[in-house]
C-alpha cells in the first residue's frame, strides 16, 4: 500500500511537470506566433524645412551579415518621400550616412530591456522534480530520477519552442547644407597604453550642420530565423531614415 502511494505521488508530480512544461512552451508558441517588429531611435533629429530635395547616401555595413539589399531599400524609401538621390556629394543638400554595426540574435534584456520567457519552463521542471526528495527521504534514488526526468521534460519542451529575438543596430549621421559658413571644434580622446589618454583638438570650417542618432530595430517570433527577420529589419531601418526628412 505504501509503495503504491509513493508511485502515485511520483506519477502525479511528473504529470504536473509535463502539463506545466507543455503549457509554458505552448503559451510561448501562441503569444509569439506572429512576427513582431519594433524600431527605436536614440535621438530625434529636427531638420529645417527646405525646398531643396537632393540627398546623397552613404550606406555601410560592418556587421557580419550580408546586406546587399539594404542600400536600394533606403534609396527607394527616400525617393518615395519626394527626394532625389544623387551620386554627387557636392550637389546634395542632405547627406545621409549610415553604418550597420550589428545584426544578430540578441537577448531581449540586451536589446529590449526585458527578460526572455524561454527558460522558465526548464527551471520550473527541475525545481519541482527536486522537491520530491522532501516527500520521502527513503526514496532518494527514485526522487533523483524523477527530478532529472522532470527537468529534461521542461528543457525538451523549451528547445522545441524557442523565443527568438534578432536585433539590428545602426548608427546614422545626417548632414544639412547651410547658406553660411560654420566653424566646428573637434575634440578626440585617444587612449594611450592602459591608463592614459591623449586629447586632440582641431577646428574646421564648413557649410553643414551634422546630426547623429542610433536606430535599433528588433524582430521577435518563436523559432525565428534570421532569413525571415532580415527583410523586415531592413524595411524598418529604411522607413526610419526616410521619415527623418
From Swiss-Prot:
Record's signal peptide: 1-22
Keyword ATP-binding: no
Subcellular location: Cell outer membrane
Membrane-topology annotation of the record: Lipid-anchor
Superkingdom of this protein's organism: Bacteria
Record's function text: May function as a virulence determinant.
Official protein name in the record: Lipoprotein YlpA
Organism listed in the record: Yersinia enterocolitica
